[in-house]
Amino acid sequence: MENAKIIGFGLYTPKNLVENERLQEFLETSDEWIRSRTGIERRYISLDENTSDLAVEASKKALNQAGLSAEEIDLIIVATVTPDNFTPSTACIVQDKLGAKNAWAFDINAACTGFIYALKLGRSLIRSGEAKNALIIGAETLSKALNWEDRGSCVLFGDGAGAIVLTSTEEDCGIKCVNVKSDGSKGDSLVIQGLPLNSPFKDGREVSKNYINMNGREIFKFATKVMEESIVEILEKENIKIEDISAIIPHQANLRIIDYVVKRLGIPREKFVTNLQNYGNTSGASIPIALCESINEGNLKKGDNIIMVGFGGGLTWGAALIKL
């Protein structure tokens, strides 16, 4: 059976770079407070670009790297919790802006695990013969979903996009395995509310609070548990040793979470890719951004085995094993 391999990649961030010190202008916080609790030093915040704009720019780089035209793409999946609109989907907007007229396109919402979910879908559709060249994108403008008066949450997030091109292959490389899971019973630990139920047939009017509401302690316990389990599970399932893994790319949420998992597993810290100090938590974009940056910097090369592991709202989590 044919598999799916990565042949192109690209990342994009808005131009507006926000250092921790700038947050002190309107928040009771400090650079030291943010760094010591999260590891984050700066993030990019969009001023006039939508999620689709970020996705398009990352996709152009990925297509150029792959040596493909937009018309050669037959599938576009965008993982996002901050779409441009309820409808049309961000993926359809991206399809139009790229001129990918032969692609069918849709969004998925699996929060910070979204890129892993999209990877599984893209791989499955290529393996089934339903697609040949797929554009898989993680893109977010989380800045529009933040309560900028809540220092506990607004300092954590940033905007950005990462994209990869998958194509069918018979080579011994590509996406080897993807495991994803969900637990909706704990979904209230991380919520961005939707529109309130307002109608002329309902007494009173509700006020929308469509910004991120997070139980930090519960998310920490959840994240550390499922990250550890997901890494162990994929190693055991694929019968591969940690020594054979060149890098582990976790969702970039908080350095404390990553450091906790490193200690629990006893895996060398240098195997874990971290760049959240420069981007903050970009949700579904964090894993592809970290992947692209690692390849661009020469830290990953053809033939390397990597594990991607994510967790997020839903609750959702998952991991993928990839041979570049």
Swiss-Prot record:
Gene Ontology CC: cytoplasm
Subcellular location: Cytoplasm
EC number of this enzyme: 2.3.1.180
Cross-referenced CDD domains: KAS_III
Main localization category: cytoplasm
Pathway: Lipid metabolism; fatty acid biosynthesis
Source species, domain of life: Bacteria
Residues forming coiled coils: none
Keyword Acyltransferase annotated: yes
Presence of the UniProt keyword Ribonucleoprotein in the record: no
Record's keyword terms, sorted: Acyltransferase, Cytoplasm, Fatty acid biosynthesis, Fatty acid metabolism, Lipid biosynthesis, Lipid metabolism, Multifunctional enzyme, Transferase
Region: ACP-binding, residue numbers: 252-256
Reaction catalysed by this enzyme: malonyl-[ACP] + acetyl-CoA + H(+) = 3-oxobutanoyl-[ACP] + CO2 + CoA
Short name of any one Pfam family annotated for the protein: ACP_syn_III_C
Subunit structure: Homodimer.
Function (record text): Catalyzes the condensation reaction of fatty acid synthesis by the addition to an acyl acceptor of two carbons from malonyl-ACP. Catalyzes the first condensation reaction which initiates fatty acid synthesis and may therefore play a role in governing the total rate of fatty acid production. Possesses both acetoacetyl-ACP synthase and acetyl transacylase activities. Its substrate specificity determines the biosynthesis of branched-chain and/or straight-chain of fatty acids.
Family affiliation: Belongs to the thiolase-like superfamily. FabH family.
Domain notes: The last Arg residue of the ACP-binding site is essential for the weak association between ACP/AcpP and FabH.
NCBIfam families: fabH, PRK09352.1
Protein name: Beta-ketoacyl-[acyl-carrier-protein] synthase III
Gene (name only): fabH
